[in-house]
Regions:
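Basic, glycine/lysine-rich polyanion-binding surfaces/domains
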Residues: 1-143
Length: 143
């Protein structure tokens, strides 16, 4: 995963961050507090992107959350369930920052492929597309 290493090395060289495997600790901005910020790679999450003119309508009919409430300032938790109500995946839905009519679904990596395949069966009837962003995006947590 060259992109992860390149990004972490950039943080190290430009922000004096200390690297430790998938953790990145930043110098203390307030030495008196004794606290420092830490960036943690959440490689157990993957992002799926749904984009296109019908993306909102498609997702509104497939997911448990109200996609109309998702904005750049507001994400929503949701699930994707089968016809019998069994949950395939739970995720956090957010607006895609670089796509006008798009959404990101952050979910566990072990269910992302299955969820993408199932949603792809139905998305062909909409003016929307779904793709994995695992090769382009990394998911980090900040402590």
């Amino acid at each position: 995963m060259a992109s992860k290493q390149t990004f972490l090395q950039h943080l190290q060289s430009h922000y004096q961050a200390k690297l430790d495997r998938d953790y990145c600790t930043f110098p203390d901005a307030d030495a008196a507090s004794g606290k420092s910020a830490q960036l943690v790679l959440l490689n157990h999450y993957e992002l799926l992107e749904v984009q296109g003119t019908d993306s909102e309508r498609f997702l509104q009919g497939q997911l448990s959350c109200d996609v109309r409430e998702v904005s750049m300032d507001s994400a929503r938790w949701g699930t994707y369930n089968n016809a019998k109500g069994r949950m395939h995946a739970s995720f956090l839905t957010s607006a895609a920052p670089d796509v006008e009519a798009g959404y990101h679904l952050r979910m566990a990596t072990d269910v992302a492929t299955h969820c993408r395949e199932v949603l792809a069966k139905y998305i062909v009837f909409s003016k929307a597309e779904i793709q994995s962003l695992s090769d382009e995006w990394l998911v980090f947590g900040i402590t």
